[in-house]
Amino acid sequence: MILPNKTILAVHWFAGWILIGTFCGCSGDSAPGGNPTAGKSDSSQKTITVGLLPKKKGISFFTSCAEGAQEAADDLGNVELVYDGPTEGEPSKAAELVSQWALQGFDVIAVSADDAQIMGAAMKKAQDKGVLTISWDSDVPADSRSFFVNQATPQQIGFKLVDVLAEEIGKSGEVAIVSSSQTSNNQNMWIMHMKERLKDYPDMKVVAIEYPGEDQDRCLETGRTLLKAYPDLKGIWAISTVALPGVAEAIRQSGKSGEVSVTGVCTPTPMKSYVEDGTVKSIVLWDTRDLGYLTIQTAAALARGLIKPGDKTLKAGRLGEREIVGDNVMLGDILIFTKENIDKYNF
């Protein structure tokens, strides 16, 4: 089960008494978490504690990732998963949580970073305390983690987003981008590659890039503002999982469903009504449960010394063998949700 922080404190207190018993001549394994020998394969049977930190709790994307993460922990059988994070998308509070977990002696901390620099600094401090660190969904500087669990390359995502909207609007017209925060590494990388891909569509003109943060109400208001400011707007990319439902609602309320296209990234369940009424034709994503699942498989393999820099593949439970490209553990294929297939997915 996913444990709250107070439970983990109790687990580590108990582990400390076991360690004392070992020094007194009793047999037993060394206490888990936060020690310099973490990652050796001779500890493959001990329970490891993994902290999974999203950009923001309460968003369907990250809730689905957490469900997949718990599935992986259950499959592995000796992983205690702690899922927690800020409720307002505040990087400083996320960094504080990383520090708390490091002090509690977690074995691995896995972070989706809303601010790569702030989170990277916190993860380096955790490393100094003997904690193994990885990132997932949104990366941090490479020197502050061992691996990045990557849903797809930023180029693949950026190119796909552009191609989908270009097809919907006839490859011409005014378009806008609604992202999350200006410090969000994954969205910034997608935008960079979107601009690159847009060179293939010279008749599409980006008139605005907005950053309302991880707040759906603010995304709704941003959508309304764009529709008023740019009456000739043909399409919008809403590239966070709160931006897409927010902007879609703005288009629906304005009566412009079918007139202004919107696509982006979101889990399918919150978007079904918008797809069914034609406000949204296509959604670009990946299986978020699988992303959470792969993150915990990666964390466990790292803690047990089963992967190391330079490896090319990872055995990842029900996902089979996953490719490692450099220090990126790759999830795989991008999914496109449409009216024809969205009811097949329930996350």
List each language-model region with its residue ranges.
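N-terminal secretory signal peptides that target proteins for export/translocation
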Residues: M1-I8
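Short linear sequence motifs
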Residues: T7, G16, P54-K55
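Bacterial N-terminal signal peptides
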Residues: A10-G25
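A residue-level marker of the well-folded mature domains of exported/periplasmic proteins
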Residues: C24-F347
